[in-house]
Amino acid sequence: MGKLNGTNPNHPKKGSRITVDPIRDEKSIKKIKRKLKSFPRDYLLFVLGINNGLRISDLLRVKVGDVRNLDAGETLTIIEGKTKKTNVLMINKSIHEALHHYLNSKVLEDDHYLFQSRNRDDKGNHKPLARETVSKMVKTWTDGMRGNYSTHSLRKTWGYFQRVKFGVSFEVICKRYSHSSPAITMRYLGIEDKEVNDILLNEI
């Protein structure tokens, strides 16, 4: 069942785009954090992903020595792999705590990738986690949640909360994402101004 003449009727049609969702509520984020707390590497990857808005490919290139001695409020300058533009990885308080929780959990050399896999290269060195591996991890973390989630969900979650919770303008988020226009950022996040206005009806 599910296939007819060698095709899967549930598979997206050729040329169609699959929308990847941000994690839109804080309860789900807290639930994932609780689930990952016993897995320091994965916990750090999640916290770092939702707090910086960087592409996962750039996070996976970070090495232990790049961030070991950074304090909260300090930054690491990176060159984006896709755009070749200079950007920064900010170490906020949540990231700093997750980072040191991870670094204290095992012996890691400065030349090790921060998010290393079990796979090794020809010289016997650990490779970084593959993007496809992280995508599977994200799908596991978000299992049972409505929506479609992958590595981009971490990056999108950062932008979603910056706009909806903190009221940061699309122009500022656009610059962080290195998008060519705020309109692209709005479509990327799937946010309309009405969605922002609706939350103002919430009573505290």
Where are the language model's segments positioned?
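Conserved catalytic core of the tyrosine transesterase superfamily
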Residues: 1-204
